[in-house]
Amino acid sequence: KGVIDALSLPEGIFCDIVPTGSAAGTLSDEICEELSIQPCAVTAVAGHDTQCAMVAVPTEKDDFIFLSCGTWSLLGTELSEPLINEKTLRCNVTNEGGYGGKASFLKNIIGLWLIQETRRQWQKEGDSLSFAEMETLARNVKPFSCFIDPDAPDFVAAGNIPERIRAYCRRTGQYVPESKGEILRCIYESLAMKYRYAAEQIEFCTGKEYDTIYIV
């Protein structure tokens, strides 16, 4: 409500916020007829695929780190209430509403977008590699030759990611990857290092140590 008031927006255009698991009603007759189904109850879910995936984390522990790894990667933990202070501001960590009134305390990171765009570029050049083939290429080259910051502005827009990676490495005085395997290895290892850095920021902000990361 404070944000709505600060922006001078009419409150009436927004829906009510309801707890996850709340009964939302029953499917209308029109929808049931269209889908050829019987009337059924509708329940409010967590409202976002990442939050829904978090519910499925196979642990009963309170302290864990989750990694939702898709086009974007979201890495964080679950807290009983939002954590907002100078540390979280400095680390650019966000709080999102989660299941059961809890807060998802997480970092947004560019994820497999880099792999997807790299594959798309090579397809344009006439080389249609499967993701499995790309993984094999990455496994067969020397590790830790060069790194990028996946969140650098260089890699946000669609386009020729392999060439941008080479330009980034050249500009930062690193080994410049040439082969497809080297490009892919650079992406995978850079993402892994970014995840480690994000996990350390989560620990810094919460004052806790986490011994498990769940990929959801």
Can you say where each PLM-predicted feature lies in the sequence?
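Short, intrinsically disordered, charge-balanced linker/junction segments flanking boundaries
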Residues: 13, 209-216
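Active-site core segments that coordinate phosphate-bearing ligands/cofactors
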Residues: 1, 5-6, 29-212
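A conserved helix-loop-beta module that forms one wall/lid of the active-site cleft
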Residues: 5-22
